Amino acid sequence: MKSKENKYDKAYLKMAREWGNLSYCERRKVGALIVKDRMIISDGYNGTPTGMENICEDEENYTKWYVLHAEANAIMKVASSTQSCSGATLYVTLSPCKDCSKLIYQAGIVRVVYICLLYTSDAADESCRV
């Protein structure tokens, strides 16, 4: 069972990485997928809010304050649909920050799988790293 789960984890992480390539952010491209019962119910990548110019960094190459993280974008898509994150798995290319970890918990996501550890938090400790 574990090897089959690991096989799917790797496949979904590859897809999350490809999704992250859609980001307009220059410094870091992050992608996220929310999967429930082996079905992708949402996706997201880091970027500016809808209707804003797709420039994520300022003149000094710092990320602008209003840029949304991939996890937040994916969770917000589910919130505006008929789906629910309850019991789902989040696949993301970068470990969630503390604010996203709170959103993940509140959304009912029970498992987080990520590629790279950037942020450390109690929520990240509960994650499965592939």
Predicted regions and their residues:
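Short, basic/aromatic recognition patches
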Residues: 5-28
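Short beta-strand scaffold segments in enzyme catalytic cores
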Residues: 30-38
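Short hydrophobic alpha-helix segments
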Residues: 42-44
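A short, polar/charged loop-to-alpha-helix boundary motif
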Residues: 46-66
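Mobile, glycine- and charge-enriched loop segments
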Residues: 71-94
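Local cysteine-cluster metal-coordination motifs and their immediate loop/turn environment
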Residues: 93-106
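Short acidic/polar active-site loop segments enriched in Thr and Asp
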Residues: 110-111
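Conserved small/polar residues in nucleotide/adenosyl-binding loops
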Residues: 119-124
